From Swiss-Prot:
This is Transcriptional activator protein NhaR. Residues 23-42 bind DNA. It is found in: Cytoplasm. The gene is nhaR. Changing E134A: In nhaR1; increases the transcription of NhaA. Signal peptide: none annotated. Plays a role in the positive regulation of NhaA. Residues 6-63 form the HTH lysR-type domain. NCBIfam families: PRK11062.1 (NF008284). The keyword Metal-binding does not apply.
Length: 301
């Protein structure tokens, strides 16, 4: 039988079943009935003269033929989605730019980074979404986002088709309400309970490692992703809290808050992550080519 032609709808349904791990999951994603999906898969199997899946418990696992077909199908549909993305953003009267922001990052710094994407006289429709680095990376790989601003880079050798550009980094400071602890920094961190960024963030993990390296026996009262909320909660409980040193410009204006120490070797990092297909996107180019050195300059006491 000649295989010079193939029904790409059948291949598309197979691709979804493989990714979802079940017919039911693919049916829900495609808003179709499981019976419809099953019929399409059978038609493709007849065309290819072989089984694409085998049963494993209640789910499915691909056969050797299924693995082979998926590798090609994944490249095909990923490439077609990239084509549609590029065509769509070129045709939009307002340039659509979907950005995911890691929820642990400083909103002030992120807003300044995103400001580079906006140019007077060039229409743009910016849409921002907050989530964890892992969730945003998954959405980026599914073409649901154009770029991610995150606190950690990606390894391009491990994440095929994705690129990471370092935007900048800044040190962190420890703050508390007056009066400050009596002991010098960093020993004073043992005098009061601490509020730190969540340990699922890169900065949170760095701080925990730093406490250990300093031999500090600290008590963690809470973990917060939002610096403003951390500051407010810290004031209520007389706790020491952490914020980027750049926030000093604001905190110095608050006479009730005092900076008790800085850690210059524990940095909060900022990285722009995007797919290869977005390299020519004007907003991506502007963000990646902007000089942010002034933005990340440390505050002066």
């Amino acid at each position: 039988m000649s295989m010079s032609h193939i029904n790409y709808n059948h291949l598309y349904y197979f691709w979804h079943v493989y990714k979802e791990g079940s017919v039911v999951g693919a049916a829900e994603a495609l808003y179709l009935t499981p019976q419809t999906i099953t019929g399409q898969i059978r038609a493709l199997e007849e065309r290819l003269q072989g089984k694409l899946f085998k049963r494993k418990g209640r789910g499915l696992e691909p056969s050797e033929l299924g693995e082979l077909v998926y590798r090609y199908a994944d490249k095909m549909f990923t490439l077609s989605q990239e084509m549609l993305d590029i065509v769509n953003y070129r045709k939009e009267s307002n340039l659509l730019f979907d950005v995911g922001v890691a929820d642990a990052l400083s909103k002030r710094l992120v807003s300044s980074v995103l400001n580079a994407a906006v140019v007077e006289g060039e229409p743009i429709h910016l849409r921002c979404f907050e989530s964890t680095h892992e969730m945003l990376l998954e959405q980026l790989s599914q073409h649901k986002l154009d770029m991610i601003i995150s606190d950690c880079p990606i390894d391009s050798t491990q994440q095929e088709g994705l690129f990471s550009v370092r935007i900048g980094e800044c040190g962190v400071s420890f703050w508390c309400t007056n009066p400050p602890p009596e002991k010098p920094f960093p020993a004073c961190l043992e005098e009061r309970r601490l509020l730190i960024p969540g340990r699922r963030s890169m900065l949170g993990r760095k701080l925990l490692n730093w406490f250990n390296s300093q031999g500090l026996n600290v008590e963690i009262l809470g973990e917060f992703d939002d610096a403003a909320l951390m500051k407010a909660f810290g004031a209520m409980h007389n706790a020491i809290f952490v914020a980027p040193t750049l926030y000093a410009y604001d905190f110095y204006a608050d006479k009730t808050v005092v900076e008790i120490g800085r850690v210059e070797n524990v940095m909060e990092e900022y990285h722009a992550i995007f797919a290869e297909r977005m390299i020519q996107h004007p907003a991506v180019q502007r963000i990646c080519n902007t000089d942010y050195s002034a933005l990340f300059s440390p505050a002066v006491r």
